[in-house]
Amino acid sequence: MYLMQLVFHHDIQAKQKYQCLQCAKGCQTFAVPLREGEGERIEKLRDWRKQLSVKQLFVKQSKLTGGGEVLAKDRHGRCLFLGKDNLCEIHRDFGLQAKPLACQLYPFVLSPLGGTFRVGLRYDCPATARSSGRSLGDYQGELKVMVKAFLPKDISKSEYNDIVPNIKVNEEVDLFTFDAINDTLVDIIGSDAMPLKVRLLWLHKFMCCLEKIKWGNVVDEEVGGMIDLLKGASLKETIAFADDNVDTAVTPPSGKPRKLLGQIFFLLSQSSIDGLTATGLAGIKHRFGIVRKMRQLVKLYGPLPKVQPDWPDCDLQALEVDFAPMDKDVSDVITRYLIGRIGATGYCGVNFYHYAMCDGLKTILLGVVTIGWLMRIAATKDGRQHFTVDDAIYGIMTVDGNLGYAKQIATGPALMRLNYLSDHLPNFISRYLGSC
């Protein structure tokens, strides 16, 4: 068996820490996918149905939500195997190796790329979102053990060497070019001498430049020069755009852009385990409720639907007032999140809807816009017109639980919606992250 190298991006290692808090948050928000044979193996450990007083241990998902089986949840959304002491009963009684591999890895994410695994994290985990605990390098030994179980025994080196996401649809590049561009994306978002809004606008402009180049015609010796040229040109255009609009009030989006953005807000704000706890007639009612809430959220006026049960009772228009400029410690949290996602390539390829790099960047930018909108909800709930670190963490944890995992966002005409909204991203960024 070919054992792939684990790669931690240096910028992620410098900024990100993690140590399990035993809060069991992941056991309540993570729809745990089961690999072939894992369900049967767990069933053989014990008569779980009798011990837990349940009929169903696993749930078959529809193709719309990803297919396959996941661990069942109770009516409160807790994993059935989570004890009252917030400890996993499988882990406690049978050891770590007895748990599904997805549980063992959480919150780590391994993205195959060019014969390596790029190591990232899920940010719906409180310890990850707050960057508390140990250096990520401390986990390398544990992750290497899990990688052996993660890879099929008949895997060949060439099969994984060939995994490199496209830059755009039908535009392949080699690993050298992909890494060079990806490192530039990290450099742009990490240029914290500039306001976050400007960096996000720069990232979007650079992405637009990437889409115009036929990378198959660029030889390795010219890649670095081409990237530097695009980086400089896109920064110049970004600064000109920001200067031209410095005194221009950014109005809330309306019409078709607001309708499609409202769909994104809904898809990235709903619970990542939504639907797993409702079956039969309750499941039908639940699905009608989803449609109703989405229809409410595509509007600019009217009551804020309770997509999350703790959302405040307010009008959607209350979220469109001007908020105070974002403090640096708040924007730093969002910056760290973006470096974590982009540095670990957790925004494209096999772990992200098989999206090309540019389509993944559009999705990530819409995710950040949604984080800005969710921060407004958190502040409004507390009667504030300024943002806190907790607001940013709430937005990140909510969005990241869906971004790349909720299949609904990538089904049907998803790419058409994505490409349409891409043209409006500068206005969305200026509107919902303009105070940063």
Regions from the language model: what does each represent?
Residues 11-14, 69-74, 94-95, 117:
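Short, flexible, mixed-charge glycine/proline-rich loop motifs
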Residues 12-63:
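Polybasic, low-complexity association/targeting segments
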Residues 16-32, 74-108, 122-130:
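Local cysteine-cluster metal-coordination motifs and their immediate loop/turn environment
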Residues 49-50, 54-81, 85:
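Gly/Pro-rich turn-and-neighbor structural signature
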Residues 94-96, 101-198:
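Internal, well-ordered alpha/beta segment that forms a basic, Gly-enriched binding/recognition surface
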Residues 186-436:
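Hydrophobic, aromatic-lined core segments that form the binding pocket/scaffold
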